[in-house]
A protein has these predicted regions:
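Long, charge-rich C-terminal accessory regions
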Residues: 148-150
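Leucine-rich tandem repeat or coiled-coil scaffolds
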Residues: 32, 49, 72-74
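Class I SAM-dependent methyltransferase Rossmann-like catalytic core
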Residues: 2-39
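Conserved class I S-adenosyl-L-methionine
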Residues: 43-53
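Conserved SAM-binding loop of SAM-dependent methyltransferases across substrates and taxa
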Residues: 54-70
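Conserved small/polar residues in nucleotide/adenosyl-binding loops
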Residues: 140-146
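Extended catalytic-interface subdomain
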Residues: 132-133
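Class I SAM-dependent methyltransferase SAM/SAH-binding core
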Residues: 66-126
Length: 150
């Protein structure tokens, strides 16, 4: 192994570490006292995650925020460059939206310095920015067929 090897430079080695340890749970537990001290400012509690990964840690923090502040809107912005991690993170979101309905969730692949403002410093890139707005879908208005004997 080369000197100064960083395990997160290799996706397979990184995934081996994060999927076989309780590292994310330990970090989430360490964040609980910090979440308990948060005093959100109007209009929402703003959360920025500089590297969403598979979303496990971020979902834990969102859950903690909901437990402490169930009626405060959440504005969550995160950066991720791996489409696989974006997919894994999106899979974990539905129950967060069900539990905390006043949530806005943004994922970008902008540079770190640009991620918090959601605006590229490069005018050419800014013009090509591709926004995808995913609106929630409700099926509660549908009447589903049943096999009831009346």
């Amino acid at each position: 192994m080369k000197k100064n090897f960083r395990f997160f430079d290799n996706r397979q080695k990184y995934l081996l570490i994060v999927t076989t340890t309780n590292e994310k749970n330990k970090i989430a537990d360490a964040l609980k006292p910090i979440v308990q001290k948060i005093k959100p400012k109007f209009p929402a509690l703003k959360i920025f995650d500089a590297g969403m990964g598979d979303g496990s840690l971020l979902m834990s923090v969102m859950r903690q925020c909901h437990q402490k502040m169930p009626h405060i809107p959440l504005l969550v912005s995160t950066k991720e460059i791996s489409m696989e991690d974006v997919r894994l993170g999106l899979e974990k979101l539905p129950d967060r939206f069900v539990e905390h309905k006043n949530t806005v969730f943004v994922i970008s692949n902008l540079n770190y310095i640009e991620s918090t403002s959601l605006k590229s410093n490069n005018k050419k890139k800014q013009k090509k920015m591709n926004w995808k707005v995913v609106k929630p879908v409700s099926y509660t208005h549908l009447t589903l067929p049943t096999k009831r004997i009346v």
